[in-house]
Curated annotation (Swiss-Prot):
Gene3D superfamilies associated with the record: 2.30.30.100
Cited PROSITE patterns: SM
Protein's name according to its UniProt entry: RNA-binding protein Hfq
A GO molecular function held by the record: RNA binding
Lineage: Bacteria, Pseudomonadati, Pseudomonadota, Alphaproteobacteria, Hyphomicrobiales
Protein's job: RNA chaperone that binds small regulatory RNA (sRNAs) and mRNAs to facilitate mRNA translational regulation in response to envelope stress, environmental stress and changes in metabolite concentrations. Also binds with high specificity to tRNAs.
Domain Sm: 10-70
Gene Ontology terms: biological process: regulation of DNA-templated transcription; regulation of RNA stability; regulation of translation, ncRNA-mediated
Assembly and interaction partners: Homohexamer.
């Protein structure tokens, strides 16, 4: 079986999407967004909060902070 390499951002976003972890996203212009990732692709992230969706382009994102620890890989301790 050929193992395909995954980008760290894809692993991170897919993990927080599956676990429905709330995120705080800071944009390069200083705007702070919060919500849950419902989908993402190479160029954007779909964020949902209070029944509203926001499409955020990745080039506008500065920092992503999860609301709780994220275990992205098997065997990773939560220390």
């Amino acid at each position: 079986m050929v193992e395909r390499s995954q980008h760290l951002q894809d692993v991170f976003l897919n993990t927080v999407r599956k676990q429905k972890i709330s995120l705080t996203i800071f944009l390069v212009n200083g705007v702070k967004l919060t919500g849950i990732v419902t989908s993402f692709d190479n160029f954007c992230v779909l964020l949902r909060r209070d029944g509203h969706a926001q499409l955020v382009y990745k080039h506008a994102i500065s920092t992503i902070m999860p609301g709780q620890p994220v275990q992205m890989f098997e065997g990773e301790s939560s220390e």
